[in-house]
């Protein structure tokens, strides 16, 4: 399992109801169901990923995330997860709203465009960066909304959302002290836990 998925695995509580957006081959859901009695669904559009999910016995729905999550009711889940897909959506801000409609908390990971190697690649060489976290050339990339660590935190403030926890790391998805100290510069991958702000007077 990728190191970023291991971190998400640690953040997911026992017996949670989980929705995994862009679930890939279903590795995370499979491990959580087996080890933590987590139930839920994965959404995936890639036929190969869907086939692998089914082979694992993971509940998977073929769905384009750009179409939203209208087929899920408010608070249908405890947690929504999306790894390395936010930057490929037409409206990432609207998807964040949808994720926090379906669940009170979400976990999101994405490549940090302000990572120092990306800055050097663009600033010194004059080309769009290609790296472990951004492996595609500019002309064939699925990424249409590249953002930075600071950009995402600003979006959360605009939406009055609470960042519960965060982790950042290099292309191998390892968290380390230097990237935690200067995440926007040294963190190649951003991992956020975000929740809705509890309304005053609301009960748990």
Describe the role of every protein-language-model region.
Residues 1-15:
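Conserved alpha-helix/loop element of class I SAM-dependent methyltransferases that forms part
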Residues 22-24:
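Class I SAM-dependent methyltransferase "Motif I" SAM/SAH-binding loop
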Residues 26-30:
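Glycine-rich SAM-binding Motif I of class I
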Residues 31-68:
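Class I SAM-dependent methyltransferase SAM/SAH-binding core
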Residues 68-74:
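Short conserved loop adjoining the S-adenosyl-L-methionine
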Residues 79-90:
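A short SAM/SAH-binding and catalytic strip from SAM-dependent methyltransferases
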Residues 93-98, 105-200:
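S-adenosyl-L-methionine-dependent methyltransferase catalytic module, highlighting the catalytic core
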């Amino acid at each position: 399992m990728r190191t970023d998925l291991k971190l998400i695995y640690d953040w997911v509580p026992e017996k949670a109801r989980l929705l995994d957006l862009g679930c890939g081959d279903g590795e995370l859901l499979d491990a959580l169901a087996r080890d933590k009695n987590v139930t839920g669904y994965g959404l995936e559009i890639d036929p190969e990923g869907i086939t692998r999910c089914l082979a694992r016995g993971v509940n998977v729905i073929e769905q384009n995330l750009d179409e939203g999550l209208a087929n899920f009711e408010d608070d249908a889940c405890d947690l929504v997860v999306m790894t390395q897909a936010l930057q490929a959506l037409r409206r990432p801000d609207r998807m964040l709203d949808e994720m926090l409609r379906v669940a009170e908390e979400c976990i999101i990971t994405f490549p940090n465009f302000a990572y120092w190697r990306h800055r050097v690649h663009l600033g010194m060489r004059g080309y769009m960066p290609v790296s472990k976290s951004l492996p595609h050339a500019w002309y064939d990339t699925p990424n249409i909304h590249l953002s930075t660590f600071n950009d995402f935190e600003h979006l959360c403030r605009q939406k009055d959302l609470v960042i519960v926890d965060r982790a950042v790391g290099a292309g191998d998805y390892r968290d380390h002290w230097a990237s935690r100290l200067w995440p926007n510069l040294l963190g190649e991958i951003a991992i956020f836990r975000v929740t809705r702000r509890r309304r005053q007077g609301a009960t748990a």
